[in-house]
């Protein structure tokens, strides 16, 4: 790292800044997991973003180890591996049995199976610089596939004309992170680090533009499939919060070459349509409604 700071002082500066931003982003889910710990329940939140984040960090550590002078990638992704492992462990402690089984299977499939296959193929079928090229394009492909995720958020914002699921601070931080890591990759002449962040920067700018466009708009009464699916099972508040948390998780994953995180969110109230009363209950319902209206009128006058 000392050699890098002397030969590429600007690269070292941007890499260090990227480490700081990414580390803060890794710590963003702490309020969420504090809630999980206090309530002894995962509250409908999903484990997928954390498993994918761990896989991403593992990939970039392997890539950095194959190259020289990539200490800055190793440090931040090593920290990411530790933090994401802790998040997943906490999730497994408090998740219901079905969610535990799903998370365990996902870990075995992605972090053991897929990563093991990549490790085996790159070690056996390639060598030297060719191995770095193959793994570099694997990392780029994974990053690009993750960058598709913000499209669902952008579509949701356009459909609902609401920026509830896309806070400006999040979009801004993702854009800055993408710029920093792009400059780092550009200065060290590593296209595999730089290229994915061009797409990340583009999506960040689009999201900030949509925020400026819809921040004062009246949201449409559109119930998305994601929220409908969440509220179909379990508590409305916790399930809706889980959907929002998952959306934010995936958006953050596309911020930098090694980052996928969450932020604390507040539950979204999603009201279910009232069940239609039987015909024989019409008179009772009408009477109850009249009484409620009268009571409300009395309170208003008293106020």
From Swiss-Prot:
Which coarse location class applies to the principal site listed for this UniProt protein?
Answer: membrane
Q: What induces it?
A: By the X.oryzae pv. oryzae (Xoo) transcription activator-like effector (TALe) proteins AvrXa7, PthXo3 and Tal5.
Q: Positions of the region Disordered?
A: 266-290
Q: Which GO terms describe its biological process?
A: carbohydrate transport; sucrose transport
Keyword line: Cell membrane, Membrane, Repeat, Sugar transport, Transmembrane, Transmembrane helix, Transport
Compartments where found: Cell membrane
Cytoplasmic membrane side: 31-44, 94-105, 155-167, 214-303
User: Where does the chain cross the membrane?
Assistant: 10-30, 45-65, 73-93, 106-126, 134-154, 168-188, 193-213
Membrane topology, Extracellular segments: 1-9, 66-72, 127-133, 189-192
Topology in membrane: Multi-pass membrane protein
Q: InterPro entries attached here?
A: SWEET (IPR047664), SWEET_rpt (IPR004316)
Gene Ontology CC terms, in alphabetical order: membrane; plasma membrane
Start and end of every MtN3/slv domain?
13-98, 134-217
Alphabetically, the GO molecular function entries are: sucrose transmembrane transporter activity; sugar transmembrane transporter activity
Any idea what job this protein has?
Mediates both low-affinity uptake and efflux of sugar across the plasma membrane. Confers blight susceptibility. Confers TAL effector-mediated susceptibility to Xanthomonas oryzae pv. oryzae.
What assembly does the database describe for this protein?
Answer: Forms homooligomers and/or heterooligomers.
Question: What family does the entry list?
Answer: Belongs to the SWEET sugar transporter family.
Per its record, how is this protein called by name? Bidirectional sugar transporter SWEET14
Q: What organism is listed for this UniProt entry? A: Oryza sativa subsp. japonica
Q: Gene name?
A: SWEET14
């Amino acid at each position: 790292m000392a050699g890098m700071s002397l030969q590429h002082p600007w690269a070292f500066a941007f890499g260090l800044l990227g480490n700081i931003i990414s580390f803060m982003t890794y710590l963003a889910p702490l309020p969420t997991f504090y809630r999980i710990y206090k309530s002894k329940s995962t509250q409908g939140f999903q484990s997928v973003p954390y498993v994918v984040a761990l896989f991403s960090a593992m990939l970039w550590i392997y890539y950095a180890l194959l190259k020289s002078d990539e200490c800055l990638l190793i440090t931040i992704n090593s920290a990411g591996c530790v933090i994401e492992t802790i998040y997943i462990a906490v999730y497994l402690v408090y998740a219901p049995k079905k969610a535990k089984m799903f998370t365990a299977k996902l870990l075995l499939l992605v972090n053991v199976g897929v990563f093991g296959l990549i490790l085996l193929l790159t070690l056996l079928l390639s060598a030297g610089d060719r191995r770095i090229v193959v793994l570099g394009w694997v990392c780029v492909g994974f990053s690009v596939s993750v960058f598709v995720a913000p499209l669902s958020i952008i579509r949701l914002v356009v459909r609902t004309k609401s920026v509830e699921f896309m806070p400006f601070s999040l979009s801004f931080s993702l854009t800055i992170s993408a710029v920093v890591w792009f400059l780092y990759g550009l200065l060290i002449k590593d296209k595999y680090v730089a290229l994915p962040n061009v797409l990340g920067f583009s999506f960040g700018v689009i999201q900030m533009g949509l925020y400026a466009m819809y921040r004062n708009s009246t949201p449409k009464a559109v119930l998305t499939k994601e929220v409908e699916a969440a509220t179909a099972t379990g508590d409305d508040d916790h399930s809706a919060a889980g959907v929002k948390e998952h959306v934010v998780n995936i958006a953050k994953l596309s911020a930098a070459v090694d980052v996928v995180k969450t932020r604390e969110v507040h539950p979204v109230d999603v009201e279910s349509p009232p069940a239609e009363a039987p015909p024989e209950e019409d008179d009772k319902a009408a009477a109850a409604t009249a009484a409620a209206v009268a009571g409300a009128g009395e309170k208003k006058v008293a106020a």
